[in-house]
Amino acid sequence: MDFLRTSLIVGLLVVSYLLVLEWNEDMSPQQQPVAQTPSVTIDSNGADSSALLNSPNTGELDTPETASKPATAEDSNISSTASSGKIITVITDVLRVEIDLNGGNVVEASLLQYPISLKNPTPLDLMQKNNGVYYVAASSLIGANGFDDSKNGGNPIYIAEKNSYSLQEGQDKLSVDLRTERDGVTIVKRYEFEKSSYSINVNFQINNQSDAPWKANFSAKLVRDKSPDPTFSGGFGAASFLGAVVSTPEKPYEKIDFSDMEESGPSGVKVNSSNGWIAFIQHYFVSAWIPLSNDTHTYQTRLRNGLYLMGFVDPEFTVEPGQTHNVGAKLYAGPKIMETLKEVAPNLDLTVDFGWLWLIAKPLYLVLEFIHDYVGNWGIAIILLTVLIKALFFHLSATSYRSMANMRRVTPEMQRIREQYGDDRQRMSQAMMELYKKEKINPLGGCLPMLVQMPVFISLYWVLLESVQLRQAPFFFWIQDLSIKDPYFVLPLLMGAAMFLQTSLNPTPPDPIQARVMKMMPIIFTVFFLWFPAGLVLYWLVNNILSIAQQWYITKKIENGGLAAKKIAS
């Protein structure tokens, strides 16, 4: 039975290690040298003229007649990054956005309240089109008469009243109007910003003063390269999914990684559905387009010349002569804060991905946030949540520790039985079972409670890993960022020492090999945790300390009870 217990623990350790390695292999962003950036010319929408953005009234992101046509310099809507249009800047209290007037699209979005690192206070660029990175948000009118369609002249050049716009003190909303006109049709592309919001409403107002009906499809897309997640810090377990997501009423959360786009070929991944949204997600942050109409949207992916596109196309609409029509969508570019995302769109909060144990993880997250609202320190909130979880499992843990203490108490008798029966395993097992029955010991009592608690521990791991609130959140003293490793490895070493102390309270396995494995486990875990985020290590350290206190109390109580019984018997 000692062998079974040890095998269970070692098996869990090995499986956890292999899962971490496999998960990092699948989820961690692949480094892509800048030299591999596509050399083709790209328009401000992030698309080549042959396929990505321009579609007629078929509601497709590319078309049969253009999909096979390679991008050429003669295509009317192609311009290199260097020849982009005039850039205007919009600044709110949380966002700094750059809009290219050649197409009127977002080519940079900086998150003002999220510095790159503690040492670099420069705001994090969620989107950008420089420094070897291509990540933009485009919205356009394509199809029969759409100004953005290549056959109609390609990207329109918009005019703005100012070069820069700022949300002033006391101002709750800021509107930025971009105007263009062609053949009697005037289009006003309006960006609407709100105070303390990462949501941007994008609206096209089409005023048709021509003599003919004007037809187009509204389209919105996110286009990016495969550049690595800037928030990825490396190390065991520190990766998060980097790729696309599509949400529909039928499938609220479907992840599409870059390899899926590569394997899907020219046709891409296509889904037709009303409502929903599309997004690119990374660790802590997300960009998403949310359609505002209840029409049937065609959600689709594309891969062209090293750029990955996730977008949607709405059905064709018609603006009669003398009429005005409005179409648009909502763009979100910001942190993955569950409460905020719920308000932006249904199921957008699922981008805070707690994994397959989300049913347990989500309540843990809500409790952690509730505690933080009172104490104001995420490190203290983690400690108090750990105490609360330990209290909930107090009786279950007590059962486990009581079983271990009883096993420890009868270890000398178990050793005597092994020596007495030697290689006669059948008689030895019989004698062991009689001993367990006599002493009322369940040999698996120390393992099963541990297994029952594992889902909670794993869920809390994901909660701490996915919570953007822990990013650059200080604890005390040298811990100034709970989302990265302890810079001096103090917490992992303390955790290793606590684990070593805890193993000394467990019954010593009679087999020398098992005993050596048990002694090595604290060292192995310490090495693992050296690169874990400090918040996770803090949780394990506090959990170990509480476990030691509970186990020591129960062990001493049982051992003292056994001594008292012996004195009475004598």
Curated annotation (Swiss-Prot):
Compositionally biased residues, Polar residues: 31-60
Biological process annotations from GO: protein insertion into membrane; protein transport
A single cellular component GO annotation: plasma membrane
Membrane topology (UniProt): Multi-pass membrane protein
Residue spans crossing the bilayer: 230-250, 378-398, 444-464, 487-507, 522-542
Highest taxon above the source species: Bacteria
Family label: Belongs to the OXA1/ALB3/YidC family. Type 1 subfamily.
Main function: Required for the insertion and/or proper folding and/or complex formation of integral membrane proteins into the membrane. Involved in integration of membrane proteins that insert both dependently and independently of the Sec translocase complex, as well as at least some lipoproteins. Aids folding of multispanning membrane proteins.
Self-association and partners: Interacts with the Sec translocase complex via SecD. Specifically interacts with transmembrane segments of nascent integral membrane proteins during membrane integration.
Protein name: Membrane protein insertase YidC
Organism expressing this protein natively: Hahella chejuensis (strain KCTC 2396)
